[in-house]
């Protein structure tokens, strides 16, 4: 017997692929007698994957090719060069799509093997929930399909260690040049005031750079630390430890791919000697190095005229200690938008929005305050970033606070214009008729984030926005006329919000998150605080009624069998346009301490977007904890890009994708 059993060979050349086939055959044996050889077979590895840089390595093995004829290579897109009997260089096409490479045996043309690859034109996930409308959809995902996202083919690939809890959504950039080489990069920031850049694909994890936002090169001064936030040494909050054990970077940063800037807000303190000195700074980091751009960070400071909580005379100033930079940052029209709420409702606090010139952070920001002559009205939205329409109008919701419909806007949805004369002019608002009741029971409308929906082509109301808060009511609003306030007291005597497009009371048990939109459907991740009961992930259709007006279905079109306890999920959707939709959510209920559900790993779930009752996969299914994630952080959102899913946890960034085959 003669063996020719060799390992598959493959190496990348430039932007192309080297594919190799190793012939295996069984010759004569048993004293010269001839044995009928087994049939030819071809194996191609890997059989699935994704290409962004147009370069990947494949290998083919041909069993029982006694004459060594090799294979014929073909593809549904792209080109081959340097073809030999068992090797070829493949260059993927520059256009996005899904492509199949086939190796066909020359000895038996009925035998072959194929590999399916996607070429994505996704440039990056630069902002919270994927886009300025906050739809949470990535429509340029070609590798992750419902048929591939199974326990057999999808799972945890690797983890990247970090120095603190990751409350931010990881951000992803394609084909970034670092140290002379192009690579995909995933960025994460921690509550220890660190920012990391990792190779998004390298296994084991490869750190490209780390920025310590408290060192002198990033504007820090001697003795600065992240702010202690739990236990007897807490310097913010009321002792609940909602952000535990420290506060550093909380709001999701935002990336400007044109300038190569990574905008992030840090929080820190010099605790001794007393009284403590608190800092919040806006940084613009270089994507390639982590170094400061624009001559370093700027200390955040602002004031407005007002006599509200914490004011001095007739001036209300920004307080770096009490204001919690909870929402994600936003970038629009050359301005970086930042919003704040409180630490555990610790007085005094207000809702602040500042807009900085993205090219010159030293210029005074434009300012808006939600309650300048009252109190509260924080902007937190369970980590959501403010939403924008294509005209540059900004939308966000506030929490409990003073309300009068004039200059105090607790439990309201606000529409602001871009910077003008140092301010952010208020254009419109909506406040539920039961605002006073919501405020009395801590029923923040602003526990959820706003989503700007695609504009329908029919109906009276064609510029729509959706919002949910703690009480689980879904509000569908006309962005051109949000509806303001329908007073329950005489003479209006309002018992509901009849002035808006649609209201669905008790549609969810409650929501601490933001819905996602895809292909005529909205996905809501409900929950109920306290941990004793929760809610399913629910889908509501968004379509035209008989009059042509686009509305939500009055009941879910599908829902998950799994029930999510507090804090509930914010869904993200991956799809190839209108096909292969997958809804991704994190079960962060074990985000403690403190939590009624204890401490434990976050669980990543994947659902068929056309039927949420069909769960495709979750990270708790595989044997031997193969896909186990790090411990949970509440309100976090998965990032889906280039065939991978990135999840921030308390100690690591976990990376999921198609398993080697």
Where are these regions (language model features)?
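Bacterial Sec-dependent N-terminal signal peptides
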Residues: 23-43, 114-116
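Low-complexity "stalk/linker" and mucin-like segments enriched in Ser/Thr/Pro/Ala/Gly
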Residues: 74-89
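A short beta-strand micro-motif common to beta-rich folds, especially ectodomain repeats
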Residues: 97-106
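Mobile, glycine-rich extracellular loop/lid and propeptide segments
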Residues: 121-418, 424-456, 462-486, 512-530, ...
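Short, well-ordered beta-strand segments
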Residues: 66-77, 113-114
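Short, exposed coil/turn segments at beta-strand boundaries within extracellular/luminal domains
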Residues: 106-113
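Short, solvent-exposed loop/linker segments at the N-terminal edge
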Residues: 48-54
